[in-house]
Amino acid sequence: MNNRMLSFPSMLFLLAFGIVLSVSAGTTHADELANQTAKVADEASIVVSTSQAAVEQTQSQEKEISPAMEEDTSNLSLKPNAQQESQSPDSSTELQDPAEQTPPETSDASAPATTSADSVEKYAQDATQNQSSTSNGPGVIRATSAQVTATRSVVSSQSGDAIVDLSADKASYRQGEDVNLSVDFKNTTDKEQDVTVYADVYYIDNKLGTYKFSKHLKAGEGYKMQSGDLKIPASQFENNHGYLLKVRVRDADNNTLSEVNKAIAVESDWTKFPRYGIVGGSQDTNNSLLSKDADRYRAEIEKMKNMNINSYFFYDVYKTATNPFPSDEATFKQDWNTWSGSEIDTQAVKDIVNQVHDGGAVAMLYNMILAENTNTGEAPVLPETEYAYNSDDRGYGAQGQPMSYTVKIPKDGQEEDVEIQRYYNPTSKLWQDYIADKMGQAMKNGGFDGWQGDTIGDNEVYSYADKDSNDPSKKFWLTEGYAEFLRAIKEKLPNYYLTVNDVNGEQIYRLKDGNQDVIYNEIWPFGPALPSEMAAVKPNTVTSRPVLTKVRQGDWKISIVGAYMEGSENGGSKADAEAGKSLQTDAVLLTSASIAAAGGYHMSLAALANQQDETDGGQGIGVLQTAYYPTQSLKTSSELTRKNNDYQQFITAYENVLRDGVENDDAQVNTFDSNGQKLSTDAKGITGNQVWTYGKKGDNFRTVQLLNLMGINSDWKNEDGSAANKTPDEQTNLTVKYALGDVSMEDAQRMANQTYVTSPDDWSKSNLQKVSASVKTDENGKPVLVINVPKLTLWDVVYISNANQESAPEADQAQTPAAQSSDDKVAENETSQPAAEDAKEQTSEPAQDQAAPAEQGQAINQAESPATEPEAEVTPATAEPAKVDAPEANQAADQAVSPEPASQEQAASQSQPEANQTPASNETPATQGNSEQPELNEPTAQTQPSSQVSPANTSVTPVAEQPTNQGQAADKADQAPTNSTSTPESTSPVEPAATDQSSDTPIVTAGNLSVQPAETETPTVPDKQGDSKANQSSTETPVADQVPAVAEQPQATEPNQAKPSVDKAAAPEALSLIQLKQQTPAIQAKEADDPEVDETKSEVTPDSGTDKAPEAGQVDSDKAPTVKPSTPENNDNQPNNANDADKNKTNEADSNKANQDSTKGSSADQSGKSTTPEDGPDNSSPEDPETKPSDPNTDTSDQEQVKPSLPVVPNQTVDDPKTDDTDTPANTDSAKSKKVADADKNKVATDSEGRQKSSEFPKEATDLEKVGQPASPQVAGVKSSVATSPEKKSEPVSKTSTTSSSDKLPKTGDHKTVVLIIVLGLVFVGMTGLLARHEKK
């Protein structure tokens, strides 16, 4: 026996030997996986070295950089290296699939243009001082004594400094594109804890949803979000709409550390709401645009992107008027520019164009429409018969000679007249053919999307045949030929945008039939653009209003207005320039406000790489001062840039209120101070020292525009400079009286209950606040709306919804999908505190009717109650006192509690325009009418548990928010049905908890997204097809019939309580079993094991005057609408019944795999990461939140039943039915579940890439010779440049490398691991034999 067995010491030796080999092999294999991750990581990431050597190198470089360059460097943003992320032993988060992670604008490494957010490594290293010597994971920044953080945007915080930078990946999104937010934030507290970023989505007065992302940070530690960390699905938005995102950072105790508002616009055609910026030469380099300034331009364009500029005017980057942008010259000199000798680097221009495209904007090449240069030595391109000839000698040359333009050029101490341009007849066929050909080539060479035409102004001329005639009947105005010219150019260049400058709008009516894509006017303080009443007064801020009125009366397109501030030619502005002063902030803002209030857009912001725009904190963002754009005599201050950013966010967020078919209202509107003194003297704003007041009306709403001119004059150009004060006296407690005319008293009372005020100024920062309003009568018995306005700094907009509440009672009965678990003690890094904890902040806020500018007006009274499921919690709804007088509230409540399926579905139909029907990217969401589908009964609660797919220590949570009512959207809001009630087996009782004002709905994590479906109401376009698909999917849901009837009760609404029609845009909301089964096997199996959740009642305080919150167990699943999250799987439009059996098998077969993987999640939690999908059950024990007192400021209208909902997959597609392939029986084998999951994720990445190709603009921008050649002038139909790179499709393998650290250990089935095990086994057997032989001897 002794000869056959080893001795005890030998056995111990073998055991130790085996352990050493196994650990070494495991480490080797994990390192190999980490290396693979580094190879396939997001190409948009910039290497950020954290070594001391890199810091020293950076510091030495900074000493050599000029002050202007240093300023620019600080404006660049950085993304940490993916390799650093994967190899960091204590990485606090895991990588996402690069295919899902990389936003369109940064996904193509081969694209010739790069943005400031992820471009030059040299400048990226300047931020290494923000990082510790040892990385704590991607994006983690250690606070230092002299921390410098690169920024991509102009951050204008309402409170706190926890938000360092806030950026979106595009200035304007095409329909069907996801919104990727990037928030750089830090833990400003003195303790280590979870810090959470919340993003609330609003459309006017309707809260559509809340999304959130959590990170565990040490005291003073910062985090730079990675691409895909915080994503809002395309289904949340409707085409041609502006939205307001309220971004907040909170600590684990739910204390708000910082708040910032940002606008998002979804526009398939930029000409619907143009926001025009300028790119021009730098005054620092003789008005040249050179490659050496490329970094400054990148940083400026990046900031303007985040100011939502969706179109750019490339000024004076042409060689000559008749050869604008040659393809064979790397650099050309502008010989016609004799006063500065400027040069243009063509590649620098192309790079900027590509960056513009990457940001979702278009690039317009500037050139004269009739000119040729005469001082360049070039011969005339056409015979003299094609010129326009002067009918007199008033400014354009001698009578009978070709019309020309002359400038004075300094020479030998004197000024010499030099002719630089001559003009052709716009009706000349030869000229039309010639210039169309040349401009077509130029736009193709530079990648431009259109032609910004310019004119020298109007003039009476003769044709060549009549040039010597004195017959008045033979002469004509140049503008009379513009329409013919423009039509001819559009016929020859149909795929390019076209607009022309009609100076001062003098002959705008003649251009009505010119077929131009957008109206552009350069306004001057003289000429017929001024109303006759101004003859005796100085020109003022309203010079654009007559032009805009003409545009609206002619039913034309939106107008862009060029109005140049101050200048330095003479007067006080010249003295200011010589003294090195800055532009007057309020003078610029009032001009922009007056134009926006009238329905236009002030073209003023410019990227000019000019030191004047940097030295006073302007961050490189210039403001146009003269007709020659590179001239920047006055500085732009940090205050002006910050406030310009606020105004751009406001104009974008409320674009539908300001200029979406809005007309002037001739009704009498007056403003009075608190003493009853009338402050509004004339509606045309001709005189100063008044509150310029006038009304406007749109589709189911009205507005009152209030512009403060108290104590100042009305000279908009401000040629007197700082000598003329432009800061008006701030007004408080104003009363606005609005005569409603023939409106009935009932309608007038309804409007009074739906009255709000907002402003871009600091007191409001775009937050919509409900204000008190009452109805009185005039001497004729007609109703007069009396409105209290709390404050007026420069510009206020009073918004009055006149939508009929009776038509949309569903607003008060929407359900809130399941919320995210608040059990942060169990899972420290799980998606952080949900709405229940948010209530702490809200309970201390004033009532909605107060004059506070914060979220009171928008996120009023919303609540939810927690669920026992992981990531789920809902708090009880609180009432909104302001809604007590709503005449239709009770009626809406009665309808809400009824078991009518129509009401149930309409209540939720306003959420997520497209997510629920999964239409193609160009399809519109379903209508409210379609939402009345009684068969939509998918049991969504049981699908929730597995929705946690967030990487360790991070999570993004679309929080289910109940939308509030709104005026205009009420009739237009057509959405897919929202989530239905939970099934019995997926519910369990929970305690209610108060919710936060802005993040008051449940949350469900998904990937690094937590779906907190919005109880929203995004107005949408009818889509019968989408509804039918949703119905089909819901009726085929297996467990749907088991759901007990639950009658949903009405709820108090957000700012538009009285008008509940359009509240239901439930962003990523609860899913059906079918949708659940379309997820990866691991997730499906996990869902089967999740604990059940029961929804508790959310009650509204009786004295709130609002309807009751919905009660659990009262909504019949057959009548309750459901909402599908925006995952590729849920976007399948194919029938689901054929695959139900297979999907059930998949759930059962993969349960074992899910249980095995669950151990990985717990490991991740121990390392300080957010809960992974497998962690769901472990965290299902909810942290019973305290029941907090109801806050009258809490959103109650958005209250819905607890419904777990499946997460939104990053970069989800909206219309790819091929994702159903993952449901085939072949994929149900538990042994293959991991491969199936990986395959699903890879397929999602590939499908999302294909989806983006069809929705992005510009067309094939990666090829320089193809950039700027859109298939049509409609942006929606043109492909994107960067996001559609073919190389991207080769990245599916990267999904393997993005797993958590626990997945990096050797895995059974890996061929290298198998070989390693075999070798170790052989070594072990050999050693055993040797020891046995030795002991035998």
Swiss-Prot record:
Q: How does it sit in the membrane?
A: Peptidoglycan-anchor
Q: What is this protein called?
A: Dextranase
Places the protein is found: Secreted, Cell wall
- Which Enzyme Commission numbers does its entry carry? 3.2.1.11
Q: Which reaction does it catalyse?
A: Endohydrolysis of (1->6)-alpha-D-glucosidic linkages in dextran
Q: What cellular component GO annotations does this protein have? A: extracellular region
Regarding pH, the record states: Optimum pH is 5.3.
Family, similarity comment: Belongs to the glycosyl hydrolase 66 family.
PROSITE patterns, per database record: GRAM_POS_ANCHORING
Where is the motif named LPXTG sorting signal mapped on this chain? 1305-1309
* Quaternary structure note: Homodimer.
Cited function: May play a role in sucrose-independent adherence to the pellicle-coated tooth surface.
Residue spans of biased composition, Low complexity class: 102-118, 845-881, 898-915, 977-992, 1127-1139, 1293-1303
Biased-composition ranges for Basic and acidic residues? 1094-1121, 1140-1151, 1231-1266
Per the record, the domain of life is Bacteria
Q: Which UniProt keywords apply?
A: Cell wall, Glycosidase, Hydrolase, Peptidoglycan-anchor, Plasmid, Repeat, Secreted, Signal
The Gene Ontology terms for molecular function here are: dextranase activity
Top EC category: hydrolase
* Species in which this protein is naturally found: Streptococcus downei
Pro-region residues? Answer: 1309-1337
Q: Which gene encodes it?
A: dex
